[in-house]
Amino acid sequence: MAANPALPPQNIEAEECILGGILLDPEAMGRIIDLLVVDAFYVKAHRLIYEAMLSLHGQSQPTDLMSVSSWLQDHHHFEAIGGMVKLTQLLDRTISAVNIDRFAALIMDKYLRRQLIAAGHDIVDLGYETSKELETIFDESEQKIFRLTQSRPQAGLVPLSETLVNTFIELDKLHEKLSSPGVETQFYDLDAMTGGLQRADLIILAGRPSMGKTAFGLGIAANIAKNQNLPVAIFSLEMSKEQLALRLVASESLIDSNRLRTGHFSQAEFEPLTAAMGTLSSLPIYIDDTASISVTQMRSQVRRLQSEQKGPLGMVLIDYLQLMEGGSDNRVQELSKITRSLKGLAREINAPVIALSQLSRAVESRTNKRPMMSDLRESGCISGDSLISLASTGKRVSIKDLLDEKDFEIWAINEQTMKLESAKVSRVFCTGKKLVYILKTRLGRTIKATANHRFLTIDGWKRLDELSLKEHIALPRKLESSSLQLMSDEELGLLGHLIGDGCTLPRHAIQYTSNKIELAEKVVELAKAVFGDQINPRISQERQWYQVYIPASYRLTHNKKNPITKWLENLDVFGLRSYEKFVPNQVFEQPQRAIAIFLRHLWSTDGCVKLIVEKSSRPVAYYATSSEKLAKDVQSLLLKLGINARLSKISQNGKGRDNYHVTITGQADLQIFVDQIGAVDKDKQASVEEIKTHIAQHQANTNRDVIPKQIWKTYVLPQIQIKGITTRDLQMRLGNAYCGTALYKHNLSRERAAKIATITQSPEIEKLSQSDIYWDSIVSITETGVEEVFDLTVPGPHNFVANDIIVHNSIEQDADLIMMIYRDEYYNPDTPDPGVAELLIVKHRNGPTGVVKLLFKPEFTQFLNLQRSNDY
């Protein structure tokens, strides 16, 4: 295939006309926002300018010259686009925005052609991948083209009358082949309980599949359009316009929807069918069936519809919530952002917005299938591999292995005292498969959780999708250890050496390697102390290395193994390569002193303890390994000693496996290390002594173990107002030079917080200064995919420690009205109430909750009142 030297399809002049037109006439933005995407612009500067315009339009701000230039400056793009010269150039080259629609279509045409070229290149490359099955190649190629066709601009809202014409043609072809304070729904009991749908309310209508969510939503929409002649906008992300129209026709004509769909209806039914078409055609119902639509696009279309109708809207229906796009690169915050935006939309247009929502499978797992509020909340969950520390033994168990267990104790924070306490778990359960995100802190602690799982901040519990980077969350400062030592000091020492520098692979001699003779001799000593005459260790010098071979003193057979092999097998750590190694659970079950012994010997292998002498000396201790799991285990063991170490990944730039460093800095943590862990060999012992001397001669400078600066706004400032203490007086008592409000921009050390607690006589600040919490900042939140997730129930504190992070297990729901549909006959065909549907009002911000019973006719996909109208 000959290379095409020409530039990719583009039209720079049209791009300039579009941008200049918007700068001249900001109202023109509404005409192209649904047609034109950012990436359609060929020139990068044009993409940045259009992105600014989209952002401003989404915030209901003008897209004039000053607003756009200000946005670009605030986001550090002003110089990149060419500054004010570029913007004024766009204005100078544009006369008006009259033809902006045609230019937008032209730009999208060029963009899609570029995308087609790129897809073509990808498909050509796939053709050369002979290692893949041909069917797989075809499938991937089709997907690329399909995704491209889906990126075309959608038609937007289409009048129902136009859709019904096509629907009637299709039906004919098939046949030939064979007053209230709110908006009244005409469902009388519902209107009586709610006073009608309140304008500016966000309403969630939830249920499991096949309960009739769409049918009920369409019924409300049709009733509002028919009885009050108010425009209704329907955004269907799941079903096409034609499918919705067919449902409305079936409900209005009372003809079986299945027979309509297949064309099997009689000649006599043409009259009610035609009448239904006429009735529905006159209704002000507008449908957009774009498969994936953002809130920004939706808002733009609703605004336009309201402007065209020159009056209020009856309602907006969205089917359904989980299919909406949030327009954010970080999916963590999207769902929360969508619901907030929908509530904002309801307030802006002063009309009820009904969002249909799919309930989780948790409903199906219960004997009573009636949905509950918690099913919609989808209480926060964590991944099955999350490790829970058992308070009774110190053992760590993955939450999935605790499934159905109860009455065991874990660690939880008592929010009254801010101290860690043991708390009993009443239930462990699986909540199905959900999208999870991995949260990582500055110390390298990580946990995978759903977007609605909550974490403790200085301002209280926040959902993961409400957290921001650099925000501090609560970690335990220390986890207590067991008081019963089940492994000898010699076993712990030998295990530390073998995990660090031992080779314990099958069909290989048990071997330990060191460049220090004293460590080789120490391993021999420890091995003899543990296994006695069952082994016959020897040291062999090979170049600069000392190899310690530890064979059995007897002949090995199929059923007779080296005693060290059996020992390591019992600990589940035999046969591991360096990057697979980890610390066995038995070590976590030891007392603090025993854990320190294990770490002392492990540190003698790939650990480092030294005083770095530069312009200013600084002590450091770190352990390096190619096993991420081992690094995490070491970090968790250090936590049992009260050391909050940092875990970091050290890339080898393709020259080998990445390394993981567990690093200890800070005077308080290093003091614990040198006092309790220390060193085995003489070189490290000398370094330990140097660090001890350095610590004794230098004052600690806390910049990591701090209380977040939000403490000023949340606790300190309200307290000094209560006590009548001025800012100047507070700073004087703290021994500071007066600096006004600049002081409030800084985090607080625990010591300074304690001083403030004394000055202000605040028990809350005092508890924070003496808490069992280490506040660590968030460095990343990343989507990882869908996986099985679990949760705990902890009566009392309602939180627990998982992966050495304090987490909660409940969330909030912010809708004004929440309704859930339940049909008993779906689960129980022999129900005494066939055809009866229950509408459960589980949350009502401005009125009562309760149950409304309706009649459901599945053949017509229709809901009806069970009782006659009553005045309310």
Swiss-Prot record:
Modification after translation, per record: This protein undergoes a protein self splicing that involves a post-translational excision of the intervening region (intein) followed by peptide ligation. The intein-coding region can be inserted into another gene and undergo protein splicing.
EC numbers: 5.6.2.3, 3.1.-.-
Ranges where the SF4 helicase domain occurs: 176-443, 606-870
CDD domains named among the record's database cross-references: DnaB_C, Hint
Gene3D superfamilies given in the database record: DNAb Helicase, Chain A (1.10.860.10), Hedgehog/Intein (Hint) domain (2.170.16.10), Homing endonucleases (3.10.28.10), P-loop containing nucleotide triphosphate hydrolases (3.40.50.300)
Binding site for ATP: 207-214
GO cellular component entries: cytosol; primosome complex
Recorded GO MF terms: ATP binding; ATP hydrolysis activity; DNA binding; DNA helicase activity; endonuclease activity
Every DOD-type homing endonuclease domain range: 494-643
Keywords linked to the UniProt accession: ATP-binding, Autocatalytic cleavage, DNA replication, DNA-binding, Helicase, Hydrolase, Isomerase, Nucleotide-binding, Primosome, Protein splicing, Repeat
Subunit structure: Homohexamer.
Protein name: Replicative DNA helicase DnaB
Species, as recorded: Synechocystis sp. (strain ATCC 27184 / PCC 6803 / Kazusa)
